[in-house]
């Protein structure tokens, strides 16, 4: 229990869009900082550390471990990679026009969003089709759109 401040955190979360964990750390952090004047600073620092862990746990439970991955793929085998993603992983692919600053050649970039559990398969597919492919990967905290959630 966060001592009743969780309701205030939920209200702030609803109207500001901040994560629930961030709202908890803001409200409870103000209380802990105020208490630092009454109690010693060492206890306040321990409380802030515990508060940080609590807020991260709240966000982790709320969002879950199911981060999606965004892959930007630059390959000489664009069509083969595109088809493999569409048919073997059953995910959509977006083809982005790009221009190589070093090579000075136009070359498409394939962008694909996959679930964490599908990422290893995507890596293996790309590596098998084109071992020289350049792949950039990032975590996507949230993915909205038709057909993504399974």
From Swiss-Prot:
Compartment(s) where it occurs, according to its Swiss-Prot or TrEMBL record: Cell membrane
Statement: the UniProt record of this protein carries the keyword Cell membrane: yes
Bilayer-crossing regions: 19-39
Family note: To B.subtilis YpjC, YqfU and YitT.
GO cellular component: plasma membrane
Its membrane topology: Multi-pass membrane protein
Name of protein: Uncharacterized protein in cccA 5'region
Keyword field: Cell membrane, Membrane, Transmembrane, Transmembrane helix
Classification via InterPro entries: DUF2179, N-reg_PII/ATP_PRibTrfase_C, UPF0750_membrane, YitT
Main localization, broad class: membrane
């Amino acid at each position: 229990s966060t001592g009743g401040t969780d309701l205030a955190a939920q209200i702030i979360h609803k109207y500001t869009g901040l994560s629930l964990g961030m709202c908890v750390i803001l409200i409870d952090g103000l209380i802990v900082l105020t208490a630092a004047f009454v109690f010693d600073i060492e206890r306040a620092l321990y409380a802030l550390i515990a508060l940080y862990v609590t807020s991260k746990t709240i966000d982790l439970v709320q969002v879950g471990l199911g981060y999606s991955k965004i892959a930007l793929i630059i390959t000489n085998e664009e069509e083969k990679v595109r088809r493999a993603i569409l048919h073997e992983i059953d995910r959509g692919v977006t083809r982005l026009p790009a221009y190589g600053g070093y090579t000075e050649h136009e070359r498409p970039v394939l962008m694909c969003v996959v679930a964490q559990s599908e990422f290893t398969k995507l890596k293996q597919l790309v590596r098998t089709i084109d071992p020289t492919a350049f792949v950039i990967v990032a975590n996507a905290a949230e993915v909205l759109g038709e057909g993504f959630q399974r």
